[in-house]
Structures are given as structure tokens and as C-alpha cells.
Design a protein with these regions (language model features):
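Coiled-coil termination/hinge junctions
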Residues: 146-210
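Short, charge-rich amphipathic alpha-helices with coiled-coil/heptad character
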Residues: 2-7, 21-61, 133-149
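Short, non-ligating residues that shape and space the ligands of small metal-coordination modules
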Residues: 214-218, 240-241
Length: 246
């Protein structure tokens, strides 16, 4: 037996469909906010900067370790120079004095060479620290920009959520007025085909903009106003009004 519903109840489906369409649009808007793409780009940039910072931090640590080894080598040489100087001052043996002076000359040259290398490494360390500082500053800039974009996104999402809550409440009000069997059919068609109700306006189905054939219009004209009919082109419940062209 065909489903029956008063024309007024059927017209409620158009309001329900409009609200469902708006809810879908709000969900799409929430997923399509421009901030989402900006945040993804910033995250990718931040990942690149973090990798660069990690590499530069490792390079700085390597140079710092090299400098520490050089400083240790200089300390060892300084200690040997001090020891040999003390031995030289206390020695009366010509042979020992000659040997100590020769060793001191070699040690002083070694110390000078190490200190020269040390200066070069210190310059490299300064460069490495400056490079790391730039990477760190760049990351801080991205973090700051990201926080600002997140705030914009959250504000937009809150606005959408508020509008969605209001729309959902309106939908609930309309749905409560629709007979249960008619609402069940509407829900079934909407879940299956994407649209639950379509307005027939001057022979055109609003669900897809398709003009119905004359034989289809003749069939519709032959149905009672309280007959619930399915649109032959969109499979939505076809709602008839004074503007349907019947």
C-alpha cells in the first residue's frame, strides 16, 4: 500500500531537506577551512626546520667536542712545558740541559700549532652556533605563525559549531512534526541517494534540476495530493505545490 501523508506534512520535508543541506554545508565548511591547508604547510616547513636544526646542533656538538680535545691537548703540552722548565732550572748536566731545551722548543712549537688550530676551531664553533641560532629563530617564527593560524581556525570552527547547533535544533523541531512513517522514508531516501525530498517546480525536480517527461508529469497528475511519490529522476520524495506546474 502506497504511503499517504497530507500535503502540509509533505511540505515539511522541504524544510527538513533545506536544514539537512545546511548541516552538510557546515560540515564541509569545517573540513575545508583555509587554515587547515596553511597549518599543513607550516607543519611541513617546521619539520624541515627541525631536521635542519637537529643537523646543525649535531655539527655544533662535533665542533665543540673537537675544541674540547684541543684544549685538553694544550693543557697536556703546557704541563709538560712546565715540568721540563722546572727540570731545566734544576739541572746542572750539560747533556740534560741540551735535551730539555730541545724538547721545550718542540713542545712550544706544538703548543703554538695547537693554539692556532684552536682559534680556527673556535671560529667554526661560532659559525655553527650562529647557524643553529638562525634555525632556532626560524622555528620560533613558524611556531608563532602556527599559533596565530590555530587561533583563527578555532574561532572559525567555534562559529561553525554554534551555527550547526542552532541548525540541528531547528531540524529537530521540524522532524518532530513529520509523521514517523514519512520521516522514515525521507531518511531512507536521503541516506541512499543523498537527498530525501525534492520540490517539483514547473515540471523540474529541484533535487537535480531535471525536467520531468510529459508522461511522468501525467502520472503525477493522476495521483492524489496525499499520495507520497518518489521522483523518477532523483529518487527523492517529490513534493508538489501550487508551483509544480500540474
Amino acid at each position: 500500500m502506497a504511503l499517504k501523508a497530507s500535503p502540509d506534512d509533505q511540505k515539511l520535508l522541504l524544510d527538513l531537506q533545506a536544514l539537512d543541506t545546511k548541516l552538510a554545508q557546515l560540515d564541509h565548511r569545517a573540513k575545508s577551512l583555509p587554515q587547515h591547508a596553511v597549518l599543513s604547510a607550516l607543519d611541513a616547513e617546521l619539520m624541515t626546520l627541525r631536521a635542519a636544526a637537529l643537523e646543525r646542533r649535531g655539527a655544533r656538538e662535533d665542533v665543540a667536542l673537537e675544541l674540547k680535545r684541543l684544549e685538553s691537548d694544550v693543557e697536556v703540552v703546557e704541563a709538560r712545558i712546565k715540568r721540563d722548565t722546572e727540570r731545566l732550572e734544576g739541572s746542572s748536566s750539560v747533556k740534560d740541559v741540551a735535551a730539555l731545551e730541545q724538547e721545550l722548543t718542540a713542545l712550544r712549537k706544538r703548543r703554538d700549532d695547537l693554539e692556532e688550530i684552536e682559534l680556527t676551531v673556535m671560529e667554526r664553533l661560532e659559525e655553527a652556533e650562529a647557524s643553529l641560532a638562525v634555525a632556532t629563530e626560524n622555528m620560533a617564527g613558524i611556531d608563532e605563525r602556527r599559533a596565530a593560524v590555530e587561533a583563527e581556525r578555532d574561532a572559525s570552527l567555534a562559529e561553525v559549531a554554534s551555527e550547526r547547533t542552532h541548525t540541528a535544533a531547528n531540524r529537530q523541531t521540524i522532524a518532530s512534526k513529520v509523521p514517523a512513517d514519512l520521516l522514515a522514508l525521507y531518511t531512507k531516501q536521503r541516506d541512499r541517494y543523498g537527498i530525501g525530498a525534492s520540490l517539483l517546480q514547473y515540471g523540474v525536480s529541484s533535487a537535480n534540476g531535471v525536467k520531468l517527461l510529459e508522461n511522468e508529469m501525467q502520472t503525477i497528475r493522476a495521483t492524489a495530493p496525499d499520495d507520497v511519490i518518489i521522483c523518477p529522476s532523483s529518487d527523492a520524495i517529490l513534493v508538489r505545490t501550487n508551483e509544480s506546474g500540474l
